[in-house]
């Protein structure tokens, strides 16, 4: 299919979606949600197509004006200048459209659930989980996204064995999905009297948040247990059975939620996480069928696997996937200024996809 045919196909799809959404009663609830999302995703692309096609028409008109024997010399000069500008614009617009035509992750527009867990490194790894958790909250605040803490499991010295949060907003998953993997930290722990450098690790999993209409969970597949929530050391922190443990029997996935005082709120949060994990599990199965070489999302948490290294002594953060190093670790972690990494990772992903299409 040619580039122009691809554009026409998108225009036709947009027309069909617009027609469907003009009569919402003809669609079911789930179909309406899907169509609305697709329509919203196509809007900026349609604007680009319109700009591209308008520029092409203007080039044709300018060329006709220049080649006409009736056009005076001054007008020809102005037309040539305008033609030069428009001809420079066409490749830029075409490149933007080529990027928009790349295979899309249908979950890119969704909100995201982040699950951060301590890997190798004991208490130091747990402290690093705490640092990452705060960094992602700061990043969300910079982007004006909504942050909803889901659950935190603390350690005795203020670290987190694991922490999860939901970050809401448009295209959150698109910008955060490349954070999935093993994050390695190199620093001297405060408890280390000899000043020896320690290496620890934490895993980050980024899951698209799934609405109930996107994934129905059969009640008979769930075992729901309630009990009294407990704090560090196992002491009870609640006199009612507010903590909730949900087991998805077919897959064995277990979600525990006890941060809220209300059993209803804990159950709601646990179901949100369960939906995201089940959706991600099904998505991974499909992707594994397409590419048997695909590795698991977060790895084992071993120090030897890593997507990014945070070296505190050198104030250095290195992303090993794109071989990019920035020397302002404290600013990035405290202020959540991740955009330079995120933008570079997105650009690298797009370049790889373009290369696959052209090869």
Swiss-Prot record:
PROSITE patterns the record matches: RF_PROK_I (PS00745)
N5-methylglutamine, modified sites: 235
PTM comment text: Methylated by PrmC. Methylation increases the termination efficiency of RF1.
Signal peptide: none
Localization of this protein: Cytoplasm
A GO molecular-function descriptor: translation release factor activity, codon specific
SMART domains in the cross-refs: PCRF (SM00937)
Full protein name: Peptide chain release factor 1
Organism of derivation: Anaplasma marginale (strain Florida)
């Amino acid at each position: 299919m040619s580039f122009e045919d691809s554009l026409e196909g998108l225009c036709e799809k947009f027309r069909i979606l617009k027609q469907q959404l003009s009569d919402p009663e003809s669609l079911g609830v789930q179909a309406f949600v899907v169509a609305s999302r697709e329509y919203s995703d196509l809007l900026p692309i349609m604007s680009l197509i319109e700009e591209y096609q308008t520029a092409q028409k203007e080039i044709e008109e300018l060329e006709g004006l220049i080649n006409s024997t009736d056009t005076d010399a001054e007008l020809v000069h102005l037309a040539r200048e305008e033609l030069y500008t428009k001809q420079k614009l066409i490749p830029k617009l075409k490149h933007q459209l080529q990027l928009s035509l790349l295979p899309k992750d249908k979950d890119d527009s969704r909100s995201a659930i982040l699950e951060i867990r301590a890997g190798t490194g004991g208490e130091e790894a747990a402290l690093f989980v705490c640092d990452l958790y705060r960094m992602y909250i700061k990043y969300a605040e910079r982007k004006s996204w909504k942050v909803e803490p889901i659950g935190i499991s603390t350690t005795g010295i203020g670290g987190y064995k694991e922490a999860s949060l939901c970050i809401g907003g448009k295209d959150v998953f698109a910008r955060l999905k490349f954070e999935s993997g093993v994050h390695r930290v190199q620093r001297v722990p405060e408890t280390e009297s000899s000043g020896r450098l320690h290496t620890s690790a934490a895993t980050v999993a980024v899951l698209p948040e799934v609405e109930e209409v996107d994934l129905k969970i059969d009640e008979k597949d769930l075992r729901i247990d309630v009990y009294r929530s407990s704090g560090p050391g196992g002491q009870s922190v609640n006199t009612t059975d507010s903590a909730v443990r949900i087991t998805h029997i077919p897959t064995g996935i277990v979600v525990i939620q006890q941060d809220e005082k209300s059993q209803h709120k804990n159950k709601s949060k646990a179901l949100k996480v369960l939906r995201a994990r089940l959706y991600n599990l099904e998505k991974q199965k499909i992707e594994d069928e397409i590419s048997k070489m695909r590795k698991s999302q977060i790895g084992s948490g071993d120090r030897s696997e890593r997507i990014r290294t945070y070296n505190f002594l050198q104030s250095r953060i290195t992303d090993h996937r794109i071989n990019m190093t920035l020397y302002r670790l404290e600013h990035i972690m405290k202020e959540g200024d991740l955009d330079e990494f995120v933008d570079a990772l997105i650009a690298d992903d797009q370049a790889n996809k373009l290369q696959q299409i052209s090869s």
